[in-house]
Amino acid sequence: MYNHNKIEKKWQKYWLDNKTFKFVDNPNNPKKFYVLDMFPYPSGKGLHVGHPKGYTATDVISRFKRLNGYDVLHPIGWDAFGLPAEQYALETNNHPHTFTQQNIKIFRKQLQMIGFDFDYDKEVDTTDPQFYQWTQWIFVQLYKHNLAEIQDIDVNWCENLGTVLSNEEVVLNDKNERVSERGGHPVVRKPMKQWVLKIVDYADKLLDGLNEVEFSESLKSLQRNWIGKSIGTNVQFKIKDSHLALDVFTTRIDTIYGAQYLVVAPEHPILKSIVSEQQASVVQAYVDQTKKISDLDRIADTNKTGVFSGTYAINPINQEIIPIWVSDYVLMNFATGAVMGVPAHDERDYAFAKKYDLPIKSVIDTKQSLPYTGDGLHINSPMINGLNIEQSQNILNDYLVKNHLAKRVVNYKLRNWIFSRQRYWGEPFPVLFDENNQIKIIEDLPVLLPNLDEFKPSKTGESPLANAQEWLYVEIDGKKYRRETNTMPQWAGSSWYFLAYILKNEDGSYTPLNSEEAKKRFAKWLPVDVYIGGQEHAVLHLLYARFWHRFLYDIGVVPTKEPFYKVINQGMILGENNEKMSKSKGNVINPDDIIASHGADTLRIYEMFMGPLTASLPWSPDGLDAMRKWLDRVYRLYHNLSELEVVEDVNKLNEEIIITYHTLIKNYTKAINEQAFNIAISEMMVFVNVLYKNKVINYKLLDNFLILLSCFAPHLAEELYSLNHSESVCLQKMPIYDEQKIIAQNVTIPIQINGKLKHTINVLRDTNAEQLINLALACEQVKQAIGDQPIKKQIVVVNKIINFVI
């Protein structure tokens, strides 16, 4: 059993001292590979065993591509701004800057202990002013292109946290109350002025871009569903006994004859004007109740609730009078905030109608039970009877639009991005306001975040930066301005950090994002070839990063429409009982402990051998032990030479070893290119088994084996390679396999009589049929089996089988 602690520390020091993994950008090398991890938020908890899974996968790819002659960019950095760092600093009475920098040191040390091939000169930190200067610059460009503006918006306000929360950061507690995901603090809806980025303007470009990338279909579906493009019709329903009208959005205008009621969102501005006096108190109580429910819960597949408004509308197609209801399953922030209820042909409408005993009218001929949502010929619809959906929609849309009763529209579920936070620990906006609240953009960047000792959020919605009096007010050309005191969300830095790695220079500076040198670098290194990270970032982070990148493409900063060519979401590592690891369950495993007991190489190779990269799989101590035993077995190939014969001439090795060796290189290469890392490891295991079986080694083959091993277990590979070489195994060239040597020279052919095996012969590959028959008939066992009986038929498949029919 080798001393992993001694060996791993030795080689980690060697790599750092010799800058073995220093980034190389050879202008004469057209082969580049950019492999990227989703950079971590440096929390106080450090790494757990789930983190190394994705990092090891990118590390294997990086090392493999380097062996194959690529210039490789495999960087690391820190997503260090944001609410979690600030909240933890408040709870522990620390400053977020001090706390964050301490955590970065811990994380960096842990990453180095696992042996990743990061060039730390390329490290980025979103809290570094040299970094966030360009975050601010991108915001300025968005503003100049009318994609950033201040809007009055109903937001999720958490008084205890002192900030606005996204819908995803709000959950329901045991009492069905809306609370913050972090800390469980009460959350209410509150109108506030917020910076908003108009990501909806890019919805179609983001959808189209999915056709240009290699994402899994499930990931593409997540993105498409989040954007939620709907092509439909806004129909105008007049309010009975009123001069008012209600715009209603539908994607199924062909079912308008079956509309039995309308539903408006509780927040709809028309509601106060149309609700009847008798229903006013009931409706108001319902509106107040809805404010406690998140949008996600409102549209979930649960029992729908609603109240009657006391008012009616007139169907423009047939003049029928139908009731107007109020229900929380309709959201004001999607389309018009009003829908028509067609219970016969919509599952949600059907459930609602059944619950409140509303009429149901079928307008599509079907023998199936209701609700029926498929195609068919229309009935009870005078203008379109006998027509299918497409024909009916064309006719009705033409009629309604021509008569100014409707218009064709495109809607998206995607909402514009609320981009401001009422917190301290974030990027300052490069924005000033004059005494008339007119905006002045700051071009001289970065706008530095002032150092505040008191940064506790207010209860009013005012940012802590409002307390930085010396920083707050600016005088320019004799005119006084007040700075924007909100800060950017944590998403900001992560929306472009993959570009920052390309711009980061050895001296710590950044090449300007808008420079010609940046364009030159981007031309070589973009897009990111492989991006690996957790499923939790499959929607928002990925969408925001794609949005910013597409915008930068549109203004000529980057040469590619999409930032990432291939995205892989690695599966989780679960507890031994298939449960998610958590402190409360006591099943969290610290990688530091595994490194101490089994070694970093064992941790790396075990996590890659567990199963497919995308699968979530349980941790197995037995599996970990087995991988350590295998590495010990590899070590003994070099240190138990008395048990093995050393054959110096490769040509004198037996056929099994040669075939296995070349098969290893071929299958290993294919497996890593397909991110099937467990298969690559299996191939290495087969090769080691064959060496032990034959009790033979050859140093040339073993050296090449160590080159393959170095992608997964770099410390041990370096140690064994150094026994006969002075240079690093990680900087060698990938061995090449010979396809011809994978094919055995001899083959064993079964001989059958009437389909039953009687004997086998070992012959040269591709021996012809006539020779095979002669060799078979010369065998005593075959002669005895045939005897004096005549052979009726001879069946021969070269290299496969001989069969005599008697």
Curated annotation (Swiss-Prot):
GO terms (molecular function) for this protein are: aminoacyl-tRNA deacylase activity; ATP binding; leucine-tRNA ligase activity
Cell membrane in keyword set = no
Its main localization is cytoplasm
Kindly list the cysteine pairs connected by disulfide bridges: none
CDD domains assigned: Anticodon_Ia_Leu_BEm, LeuRS_core
Q: Which InterPro entries would you find in this protein's record?
A: aa-tRNA-synth_I_CS, Leu-tRNA-ligase, Leu_tRNA-synth_edit, M/V/L/I-tRNA-synth_anticd-bd, Methionyl/Leucyl_tRNA_Synth, Rossmann-like_a/b/a_fold, tRNAsynth_Ia_anticodon-bd, Val/Leu/Ile-tRNA-synth_edit
What is the enzyme's class at the highest EC level? ligase
Motif 'HIGH' region — list its residue ranges. 40-51
Q: Name one GO biological process term.
A: leucyl-tRNA aminoacylation
Question: Which ranges belong to the motif 'KMSKS' region?
Answer: 580-584
Subcellular localization is given as:
Cytoplasm
Catalytic activity, as annotated: tRNA(Leu) + L-leucine + ATP = L-leucyl-tRNA(Leu) + AMP + diphosphate
Record HAMAP family: Leu_tRNA_synth_B
For this chain, the family text in UniProt reads: Belongs to the class-I aminoacyl-tRNA synthetase family.
Recorded protein name is: Leucine--tRNA ligase
Name the gene for this chain.
leuS
